Structures are given as structure tokens and as C-alpha cells.
């Protein structure tokens, strides 16, 4: 990617961010309601179009040819193995092939979101089918018969009927069951594990919000310029800035989803959570409160939404209702109160050490520089802070 100055440019506003990378930075569920774009995303679409038009090194015209590329990329991003959409869906989307350029220029996201809504519908149909087949147990799978499964399906024809996808997903499921059998797992464990896996996938899909859909659609657009130009949603933009600045304000805990819970994976060394000695890896967070406020139950929430509640201004207090890792039942919760502080992510910073290596009875000292990631504190840089951190400056020092 060649940006105007061959440096990466970050644009961030209330509705999100657009990033040009220079190459270095590189159960039967109820049908969810269709996700609709909001006013900020309409503004962001128009702004992104203008930025790419005037700031990108590749001065491409937003025309029918680009619109066609956007549709192809969007469908590929959503369904790369052609395992969800039907040929009838694709035929319907063909009506949008030369309209997306005009849509984006006006900030009209109707067609982009309509495609996603259909994708979500097809996704749920596939997962419902898989979960139904799993309920039939091991008797549903005959491993004595010859069978084949097409793995690379990027160029496979779109299925004409739902029955074709049923056959594909049955074979996929059969392959997954067989793989687990070969690993030594018993039938009961296999079907429990797979049911949990697919149920989690379905739940995660149905938790997607407008900014997730918008980010996917806009990146189908930005990628037509080059693969390193991306649109960031507000949350993604915030996380990007945190990672680049190597600091955040919070409690210093790395979280991940596990079933319907948010689990603590590890504690950041010297962070408030570790210093409190009240939290441990594998503890599960079930509710969050700000200061003396009411607890908000977060079971079933997305991890990023839980993180939003836990992060906050330095010296403010957050209370967590936690289910300890060693709890024998789900009623043994405890309340943990932690004062937020600025967390330095030093493990991601440039590191140096001197190694002594012996060769032919002679010792040699070798200097080693380790770069876990590339970073730069843009906020401090733009504010004129002479001591702002970046990969280049830390290595030089």
C-alpha cells in the first residue's frame, strides 16, 4: 500500500476510524431482528468515500466497475466457502451489483445491510440444521461407507437448493465427529463438545451489532483500493489506539468468552487486578457495577461489551461480581472492588537483552532486540509530547 506520505494515516471521529496501513502496520434460538444502520454510520460512509477519493494514493473512481468489485468482495468476506448463501440469494444480490457506488456516495446502506440480514438468516438455518443432526447422536453417522468432502470451496457453484447445503453440512459434521473419535474422545463427550461449539457460533452471530455489519461492508469497499486500507468501527478504533499506545485505563485483566461467561485469562503484571489479589485466571465475571451503582448482569454478553463496562477513568472504582474458578456451583459468587489505573502494556514494548555465546572456547556477547509488535502513541505524538513512545524511538533509545 502506498499512502500519500507513505506513512499510516489514522482518521478517527465519533463514528469510527479509517486506517491506511503502510505495510509495516500491518438451543433453537429466536430469529434475531434485522440489524439496521444508524445516522452516524450514514455519515461515516459518506466521509469514508470522500477520504478515499481525496487522500488515497490510488485515485480510483467510485463507479460501476468498483461497485461490482465491492459486491464480490462483500460476498467473499461473508461466505468464503459458499456454504450459506443459495444461488437464488446471489441472483437477487446481482440487482445491487452496479448500485453500491451510488449507495455509498449518498450514505445509503440499505443494500449492504440487506445482504447481511440474508446472510444472518442463512447462517442460522445452517446452525439449526447442524444442531438438529447432533441431537440424533452417533447412530446418525455411518463411518463404514465411502464418502468425500470438498474442503476448498472458494470457487464452488452456489447451492441451488437448501438440500445441497444440508448434504454439505452433514458431511462437515460427520468429518468433525470422526476427527474427535480418532483423537480418542467418547461419543458422549464428542456430541456435547460439538453442540457447545455450534451453539456458541450461532449465539456469537446473533450478538453482532450495526457497527460490526457496517465495518464488514465498508471494508469490502476499502479493500478495493488495496488490502491494507481498513475502516475501523469506534470500538475497533479504540482498541487499535490502546494497542498502539501500549496503555489503557482499567483493571489490567485479559478476558475471553467461554460459554455465556466472560472469563479472566490472565492478569497484567503489576496491574490493579493483580495487586488486589482478589482475582485469578479462570474466574468468571457475571455482573459489573460502577462505583456504588447497581450491578449489570453480563452473562451472555459479548466480551467487548463487558470490557466497555470494566474500562473507565483512572482512579474510578469498578465492582465485579465474580464466580471463582474453584466454585462448585453457580451461587458461590463474590464481589470484588478495584480502583482503575493506567495500565502499561510493557510486555508488548521493544525489549533488549545481551546473550553470551561460547564458540571455540571463546565468549561472545550478542545484543538481541525483540519487537513483539509495532506501536506508536498517536495521541501523545499529535499533542506534541516530546517523550511519546514508538517502536522506532524505543529501539533507538
Question: What are the residue ranges of the model-derived segments?
Answer:
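Cleft-lining beta-strand/loop regions that shape enzyme active-site pockets
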Residues: 2, 27-37, 53-63, 203-210, ...
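Bacterial N-terminal signal peptides that target proteins for export
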Residues: 2-11
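Bacterial N-terminal signal peptides
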Residues: 12-20
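Solvent-exposed, polar/charged alpha-helical surfaces in well-ordered, non-transmembrane soluble domains
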Residues: 42-46, 50, 64, 68-76, ...
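Extended, small/polar residue-biased N-terminal targeting/export presequences
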Residues: 62-68, 72-148, 202-257, 317-319, ...
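PDZ/PDZ-like domain segments forming the peptide/carboxylate-binding groove
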Residues: 76-77, 98, 112, 117-128, ...
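AAA+ P-loop NTPase catalytic core
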Residues: 157, 166-226, 230, 237
